[in-house]
Structure formats: C-alpha cells, structure tokens
C-alpha cells in the first residue's frame, strides 16, 4: 500500500508541493460514461490483460534490500535537490494514478465488473510505486504526506476521452524513461548512485502493461481514433505530453548529468520512442523528425529558464506576471507552430483498425 506518512526518524514530512504547469495533477472524470463503455471490440484482449494483472508478476519486486542501507551524503547539493524533486514529482504522479484508478474501480464495481477489476489492479500497482518512491525520499530526509495531499489538493476534471489519451501516453512515456535509464546504467554502473535504479527494468513492465490496457480501451471506442476531431485531440495530447517532458527533463538537468546522461539527448530519445509506440495506437502522431520540432521545443526550454529567473526575484506578484506574459506567449507560439506541422498518418501502417 501507499506509505501515507514518513517514519518519525526519517526527516521532514512534505504536505505541499511546488505548484506550476509541470506539477502532476490529481484527476477526476465522468464515471457514468466510463460505466457505459462498450468493450466488446476489445473484450478478448482486456480479459487476457486482466489475467496478467491477476498473476501479479511484480508482487515481490518492490521490496527494499540491503543496498538501501548505504549513505547518500556524497551527492552534491544541486544533484541531491534535483533527485529529490524527481522523486517527489514521480511519487505524486504515481499517487495521482492510484487515486484515479481506485475511484474508477469503486464507481464501476456493480456496473462494469471487468473494467472495475482492471482499475483495481492498476491502482494496486500505482500504490506500490508511490510507496516505494516515498520510502526513497525518506532516505534523503523527505517524505510526502500522501493522505494529506489526497484531501487538500484540487482535483481537475478531465472528460473520459482525455483521460484515456493522457494516461495511455503517461504510461508509455514512463516505460521509455525507466527502460532507457536502466539500460544506460547497466552499461555504465559507475553512474548508478542510488539502488532505486536497479528496480526500473521490472518497474517499467507495469507501465507498459498499463499502457497496453489503455490502448485496448481507446481501440474499443472507434470514435477516439477516427475522424478529424479525434486526430486533432491526439496531436494535442502528444504535444502536451512531449512539451511537458522536455521542460521537466531540462529543469532537472543536474540529475540526468549525475546519471551520465545528456538531458537533451535523453529527452529526444524518450520522445522519439514514445511517438513510435503511440503510432501503434493513435491514427496520427507528430512528425518528430521535422527540423522545427526539437528546435522549437528547445526554444521553449530557453524561455522557460527566463520565466524561472523572473519567478526567483522578490518583485511583486503583479510585476512578475506582467514580465512573464510575453515569455508565456512566446512558448505558446512555438507550441502552436509545432502543432501545425503536418502530422504522420500512423494508421496506414496498421492495415485495419482492430
């Protein structure tokens, strides 16, 4: 289960997190619409995935071993801060998934038993992940008070189709983040400064499995992949997830540097792999090979750094907001230009929708 409160000897209990556009949100959705989903087109696939989830291949994986008994005081202050921020946001993201899946399972229990059990088991996985990350933070004198957060943070309503798109992408991009870091450290163990990374290979299997479940849910609803409206939304959410990833990775560049990774190269590999994976689910994906794609994302990073510099000043809030506005509009302009780039027709590679 999720660790709600820290060990009293482990240090500071964190009850709030720094809120900005990159902070993971807590979501709610249209449970009535979810209960009415016709899953017949993907019934066989979903039942097979449910059997996998019941098998619970990772039931014994998230157990801390003796490697966690070391000391991490040798990390420099910048790397330590960036790593704690990484753990904190990752923990909140996993806990957000737990809350959403748990509520979906509860609401659907009597009306859509198949989907209810799937969400129940996905909530189990997310709880494990959040709890494991929270224990990692305790090693650095921090811990999230997740119970407090669940009661006090604002929940954002997302229509069900948005939930399906975004959670699918979140799980798949999470898979690629974990496996790329794991494979890199497998080749360069000298950069593995904390034992959490040894768990990423099996961990990412949960992310991949969850993503496959959401792929089946999306494909069970043809209106989510067909028609111009659906294609515009798919492009929008791909861009939103990729832009958020780019800004977040570069904000934590010191963390990736400590792992022996170049933040920009890592970001681009994760985006390329996720876009390639999404092409098996979405009927259109972004053209990440277009020369403007990464160059405009990089400009967003540079502008974001200026926004952070403004926020760090002691000026009045109204003046900060005024100074930020042209930079925020500039980021919006770059993202709009990326969005308007001709997309890639992924569906032509499938043959037929199934």
Swiss-Prot record:
InterPro entries: AcsF, Ferritin-like_SF, Rr_diiron-bd_dom. Its cofactor is Fe cation. GO terms for molecular function: iron ion binding; magnesium-protoporphyrin IX monomethyl ester (oxidative) cyclase activity. The keyword Membrane does not apply. Pathway: Porphyrin-containing compound metabolism; chlorophyll biosynthesis (light-independent). One of its GO terms (biological process) is light-independent chlorophyll biosynthetic process. Its EC number is 1.14.13.81. It catalyses: Mg-protoporphyrin IX 13-monomethyl ester + 3 NADPH + 3 O2 + 2 H(+) = 3,8-divinyl protochlorophyllide a + 3 NADP(+) + 5 H2O. It is an enzyme of class 1 (oxidoreductase). Keywords: Chlorophyll biosynthesis, Iron, Metal-binding, NADP, Oxidoreductase, Photosynthesis. The keyword Oxidoreductase applies. CDD domains: ACSF (cd01047). Belongs to the AcsF family. Catalyzes the formation of the isocyclic ring in chlorophyll biosynthesis. Mediates the cyclase reaction, which results in the formation of divinylprotochlorophyllide (Pchlide) characteristic of all chlorophylls from magnesium-protoporphyrin IX 13-monomethyl ester (MgPMME). This is Magnesium-protoporphyrin IX monomethyl ester [oxidative] cyclase 2. The gene is acsF2.
């Amino acid at each position: 289960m999720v660790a709600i409160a820290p060990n009293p000897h482990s240090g500071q209990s964190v009850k709030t997190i720094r809120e900005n556009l990159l902070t993971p949100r807590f979501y709610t959705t249209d449970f009535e619409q979810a209960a009415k989903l016709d899953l017949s087109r993907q019934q066989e696939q979903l039942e097979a995935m449910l059997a996998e989830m019941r098998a619970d291949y990772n039931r014994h994986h998230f157990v801390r071993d003796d490697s966690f008994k070391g000391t991490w005081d040798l990390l420099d202050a910048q790397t330590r801060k960036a790593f704690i921020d990484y753990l904190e946001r990752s923990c909140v993201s996993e806990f957000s998934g737990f809350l959403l899946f748990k509520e979906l399972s509860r609401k659907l229990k009597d009306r859509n038993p198949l989907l209810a059990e799937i969400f129940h088991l996905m909530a189990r996985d997310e709880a494990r992940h959040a709890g494991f990350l929270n224990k990692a933070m305790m090693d650095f004198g921090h811990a999230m008070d997740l119970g407090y957060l669940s009661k006090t943070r604002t929940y954002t309503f997302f229509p069900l189709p948005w939930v399906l798109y975004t959670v699918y992408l979140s799980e798949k991009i999470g898979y690629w983040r974990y496996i790329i870091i794991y494979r890199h450290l497998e080749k360069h163990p000298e950069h593995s400064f904390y034992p959490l990374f040894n768990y990423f290979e099996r961990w990412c299997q949960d992310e991949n499995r969850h993503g496959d479940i959401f792929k089946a849910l999306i494909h069970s609803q043809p209106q989510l992949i067909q028609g111009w409206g659906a294609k515009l939304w798919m492009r929008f959410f791909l861009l939103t997830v990729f832009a958020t990833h780019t800004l977040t990775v570069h904000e934590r560049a010191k963390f990736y540097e400590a792992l022996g990774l170049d933040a920009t190269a890592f970001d681009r590999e994760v985006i390329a792999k996720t876009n390639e994976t999404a092409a098996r689910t979405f009927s259109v994906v972004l053209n990440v090979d277009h020369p403007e794609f990464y160059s405009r994302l990089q400009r967003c990073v540079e502008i974001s750094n200026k926004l952070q510099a403004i926020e760090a000043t002691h000026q009045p809030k109204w003046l900060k907001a005024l100074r930020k506005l042209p930079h925020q509009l500039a980021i919006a302009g770059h993202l709009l230009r990326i969005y308007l780039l001709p997309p890639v027709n992924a569906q032509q590679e499938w043959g037929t929708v199934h």
